[in-house]
Every structure is written in structure tokens, then in C-alpha cells.
Amino acid sequence: DPYINIDAGTFSPYEHGEVFVLDDGGEVDLDLGNYERFLDIRLTKDNNLTTGKIYQYVINKERKGDYLGKTVHVVPHITDAIQRWVMRQALIPVDEDGLEPQVCVIELGGTVGDIESMPFIEAFRQFQFKVKRENFCNIHVSLVPQPSSTGEQKTKPTQNSVRELRGLGLSPDLVVCRCSNPLDTSVKEKISMFCHVEPEQVICVHDVSSIYRVPLLLEEQGVVDYFLRSLELPIERQSRKMLMKWKEMADRYDRLLETCSIALVGKYTKLSDSYASVIKALEHSALAINHKLEIKYIDSTDLEPSTLQEEPVRYHEAWQKLCSAHGVLVPGGFGVRGTEGKIQAIAWARKQKKPFLGVCLGMQLAVVEFSRNVLGWQDANSTEFDPKTSHPVVIDMPEHNPGQMGGTMRLGKSRTLFQTKNSVMSKLYGDTDYLEERHRHRFEVNP
């Protein structure tokens, strides 16, 4: 990722979507969450390389005197550091078999021509000669817009971006065209001619019924065969048993009829990427029980009495959505805004006996709600919102350092031991002695 941030930990969810947490506590872009889920692998924070991280690494080496007094430049020092980082990470096992990976996939974010991408593009230009042609394949993803007024697929943006990329010393081996409808043969041939690739190297990824159709789409267009040839991979061309199972799952997803609706009550509901992992978990759960998922996004501030005074229509619409859902999920969040609305939703779910799941702040607020309305502790609160409360049912943890925002939470995989065998949670986890889940929070329920 070419941004200057060291990691994704302090991003606003509105700007970059959710922050994805890895086993080792790395706070990374949500794309790494997609890679982990789709490939069933476990990544570390070093799998996410940002401009900020590489500059910090090189500057630290310079401060220690590792460059022996030389002037430190973007080329070769930054570019060499990028290449060494990639080579180092490419050898680290990422799945349970513990074997060294045969292929390393590198996603370079941003757009060709971005100033901040330049050191990375130059690094990979050099890299392709170091590792030889048969070990390097460059896939260029480009948008092929289709204005509704004319219906014509426009290839100019693709031509221009490929020309610019070639000018920087990288030639695409595959041009992957993202479009709303399948590419016409004439459009494919045009892209092939102007982008200096064969027509079979122009891959069309058009809109499909579900994301599970995309690997099947790529397989149909011979992408696997292309990789086997160009990278000389030592893999036998065999019947795709795995993709047959995958196709069954994609077909099952498209045939779902019964709907299950979940109200997601949060602060950042205007951008669904803010809760990407929660939404994916709900989708997978719905598919497992053969139901189509309908998520009703509810901004928690719309449930608060103040909204009834200012915008009664929004208030009633929000409550109508909540009441019509089969279950309620309150995800995590930071800060006091919208917390009273979440507590209102939690109280309603408890009284109506609606299935409810609280994650992170959602769970903490469920404890606050129960303390106030069942135990009668009217001022019960989290010390995050009311440090002077006489009933601090949620408190900050010993790991928390209030001074600095970045990297001051309980982060990454943590083991939780069950104290009692007959709890609801223990049964849900299959009567195990402990569970291991990933954490990202500064506060916990007061023991």
C-alpha cells in the first residue's frame, strides 16, 4: 500500500473501510482479510508493506550507521529494501502444512502514475530481471467503463494506463478488464492490439451474481493454463476437484430462497466496508444454513430520543427496520457518539427476546444495559465514556496507554479460558476448554 501510514490502525472507517486484525496483532487493510478468508491462510503484519513502513525501516538503518556514511536515496536504497522485504516474506509458510510457498502474490495498490507508487514500480521493474522472466508475471487490472447513454465499452483508460506502465518499464502479461458486461470480441481485439498482448491475455471480469463466481470466470478464460505455461509451474494439469466443489457452492448461493434479516446497528453504517468482516461472517453463516442474508443497516444515532425531536421520520424508519429484523447485531466502535442508540437497540432485543449478538463495544454496551435496567445501577457505564461513574462495569485494561493512539490496544490472537462448562458460550464453541480469537480493544468487562 503506497500510503505514508505505518499501518492501518488509525484509519477512519469512512476513509478505508474496516481495520483488519491479524494473529500477531498487525492492523492492516481489509484486503488482507479477503486473502485470509479466500485462501485459508494466516498472514502477519509483515505481509502488509506500506511506504511509511519501508521508509521507517530504511531511516532506522541509516540512523544505526548501516549504510556506512553513504547518501541514502530512493534508488537504490528504498527500492532494494522493498525487493528484500518481498523476497523474505515470500519464503515464510502461511498455511497449516508449514511448507515454503511456491508462488507469492503481490498486490500493488493505487493507480499507475501515482507519485507515491513510483518507488514500488521501480523496485518491481528491477525485480523482474533479478528473478528472471519465468518467475515473474505482471497482471494489470483496469476498468472498462460503459456509459449508459451510449452502451459502448470504452478502452481508452486501459490503453493509457498500460502505455504509462510500459513507459515505467513494466509490461503487463495479463490485462484484467473490470466491466459491467462481458467484453465484445472487437473490444478484446482492440485492447490486445494497443496494449501489446495476445487476445487470450485479455481477461474479462464482468459483474456476476456473487463473488464466488469470479474464480470460475477466470478458470473458464484459461488463466490457470496461462500461469502453468508462463511461470513453468511444476503442477499437473488435472481435473479441478476443488473448483467443482466451489461451483457447487456458487450454485447453492444463487439458489437460496429463504431470507434471514439481521439488523446491524452501528456508527459507520453509511459505508458497509466499515464492517466487512462482520458482514462476511454473517454471509458465510447464512450460506451454511441455506438462507439468503438481508442486512438492515441502522445508524445507532437514529434510534436516540434526540432524533425523534429533530428528524422524526428518520427515527421511526430506523425503529421500523429494527423491529422487522430476525436478529440484532451490534458491532464494535470507538467513542461516545451513538452509544445510547445502541443501548436502546440492545434493551429492545432483550425485552422482545430477539436473537442478539454484541461484538466488542456491542458486548460491553450489553453489559451496561443489563446493569442499568435489570440490576438497577442507573449510572452504570464504561470508563471510556464516563470516567467518574460509581458503577464502572467496563474498564480499561492494563495494556492500555492513554497517551498514544497507535498500537495501544490488546491486539491479535488471544487465548480465553472457560471457567464454567455449562455456559451458553462454551456450548456454542463445542464444549472446549479454551478458545482463541482475535482482539482489538482498549476496554474490557470489569471482572
UniProtKB/Swiss-Prot annotation:
Recall the GO molecular function terms of this protein's record: ATP binding; CTP synthase activity; identical protein binding
Q: What is this protein called?
A: CTP synthase 1
Role according to the record? This enzyme is involved in the de novo synthesis of CTP, a precursor of DNA, RNA and phospholipids. Catalyzes the ATP-dependent amination of UTP to CTP with either L-glutamine or ammonia as a source of nitrogen. This enzyme and its product, CTP, play a crucial role in the proliferation of activated lymphocytes and therefore in immunity.
Where do transmembrane segments lie in this chain? none
Q: How is its activity regulated?
A: Activated by GTP and inhibited by CTP.
Q: Does the keyword ATP-binding apply?
A: yes
The record's keywords, sorted A to Z, are: Acetylation, ATP-binding, Cytoplasm, Glutamine amidotransferase, Immunity, Ligase, Nucleotide-binding, Pyrimidine biosynthesis
- Source species taxonomy: Eukaryota, Metazoa, Chordata, Craniata, Vertebrata
Which residues in this protein are found as N6-acetyllysine? 61
* Ranges where the Glutamine amidotransferase type-1 domain occurs: 261-447
Stored CDD domains = CTPS_N (cd03113), GATase1_CTP_Synthase (cd01746)
**The protein's annotated pathway:** Pyrimidine metabolism; CTP biosynthesis via de novo pathway; CTP from UDP: step 2/2
Listed Pfam families = CTP_synth_N (PF06418), GATase (PF00117)
Q: Which GO terms describe its cellular component?
A: cytoophidium; cytosol
Localization terms from the record: Cytoplasm, Cytosol
Q: What is its EC number?
A: 6.3.4.2
Where mainly found?
cytoplasm
Family, as annotated: Belongs to the CTP synthase family.
Q: Which gene encodes it?
A: CTPS1
Q: Which PANTHER family match?
A: CTP SYNTHASE (PTHR11550), CTP SYNTHASE 1 (PTHR11550:SF8)
Using the UniProt record, name the top-level EC class of this enzyme in a single word. ligase
Q: Which residues form the active site?
A: 360
Reactions it catalyzes: UTP + L-glutamine + ATP + H2O = CTP + L-glutamate + ADP + phosphate + 2 H(+)
The UniProt entry's GO biological process terms, in alphabetical order, are: 'de novo' CTP biosynthetic process; B cell proliferation; CTP biosynthetic process; pyrimidine nucleobase biosynthetic process; T cell proliferation
